[in-house]
Amino acid sequence: MKYSKRYIAFTGVLAVALLIKFNNFGEQYQTVNRFRGAQLEEETWNPLIAQSVNEGLLSVVIDNKEYTNEKYPFFMDSNLDIMVPVSILRDALNCSAHIYNEDTLLVEKHNSELSFSLNDDMIEVNGKKEKVVSPLIKKNKEHYVSLNDLSNYLDYSYIWNIQENKAQAADVSESATIIPTKYDLRDRARVSAIRNQGTYGTCWSFAALSAMESVLLPEQNYQFSVDHMTLNNGFHLTQDDGGEYTMGMAYLASWKGPVLEKDDPYGDNKTTPDLTAVKHVQEMQIIDGKDYEKIKEAVFKYGGVQTSIYNSLKSSQSRSPYYDRRTSSYCYIGTEKPNHDVVIIGWDDSYSKDNFSVDLEGDGAFICQNSWGSEFGDGGIFYISYYDTNIGTHNVVYTGIEDSDNYDHIYQSDLCGWVGQLGYNKESIYGANVYTAESNQNLTAASFYATGKDSEYQLYVVKNFEDESSLSNMTPVASGKLSNAGYYTIPFDKQIALDAGERYAVVLFISTPDAVHPLAIEYEADDATADVVLDDGEGYVSANGFEWENVKNVENCNICIKAFSNDR
């Protein structure tokens, strides 16, 4: 069922709006008098109403989460529609929303597919033309769409509350899921180019960067350098030694990359270490093992998801009892651990079990992108059964890929990232990293790893840090809860001014259900981390936030807490 309540302007309300608009009661009173006797025309009054709404605090509540125009650029247009930025739709409406060719918006949720064209009052709803009042527009480099129109066609209720200056929308669909039973990113131009890793053990890097490229599509088309990621990541490994997803996360989180393929081409075993990242990755979510619904939602909303499988094939030309070349279908059931990374780019719940070379209980498969060139499978793509032992066990989706000018400075001491975990045999812990401001700056955000799902966090800043006793003067700057494990950058509620040379601490309290060691740390764990640098950080830990100890006295390690600032 759908509900919609439009903004109705009565004469008395309009008169009040005009009296607010026109401050003087003398000369301009005659203007009001003339309007009272005139026919109330929408083109005259609606812009005044919209202006009055936009000048105040405008609140938009979507599925019980509140947004305001203090932080997000919502506005009411001259048709009295609340226009919302397309950039928030994916998370706010829990849907797929992408801009094609700068002039077309495709929104998908449940079984609905909406296509908006720039400045066109006709949209397509599941292939059928429908007329809307407020078309898709572009303003200040951002696309905007009517929340009322989205609500009408995505099974949302919509209410405008004039007294509170608040729009409210809520999903009232009877569907239990936001995703269809079949979905393929190839049909939506959201799959990156098929590439070939050759004889090197670089599948983990191809999977990570291909997944990132998919997330950026169709709005941005990039090809990132695998050579740079595999040869400049801080780990003591060659391209023949292989790797895994946390290595890629560390490389990206530290702003070492990504860099462009054309600037550091693949396959020559050479690299250019002084290249700078063309994107800054600020968020990478780790989806729980075998949570197929969440994996599908991530593909649907964001793009390709990096995952790991056990691959019994040695090359695109080899054979295996687990792979059917006729149907490009693979399923391994056994005890072997993952040895190969691929990208999930879709799924088909009805994909027949008869397409596989092994006997299976039921239908269904993920559609996956490999890094063995277009000669493998169906142009580089193959199907992996839902019943495969390892598919969907380790999953990463790159949800926060930002422009490289998002912050002026990064402060960090954990270039190898999340190598291990530290704790006091309980769910919560305090950790703090101390840094020195390089110039006059505003501290605006911090990042850390959530080592398990449903982690709750609180972030604090300590100015003018001298020693452990300074940690009693913490200023709260952010708090929240994270649904998935992963790497997160949290903007502060307020900026903290730092002077050049000032020592400061960023403090993290984190609580992770069922954890005993919830704090991510960097340390020398094995041959791969033999080159880790541990004398570049100053960190402290506490069980209660009152008694602190230098982390070097607990474990020879660095704490994974970074800080971000802008010049002032």
Question: Which residue stretches match the model-derived regions?
Answer:
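Surface-exposed loop/turn positions
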Residues: 141, 303, 486, 500-502
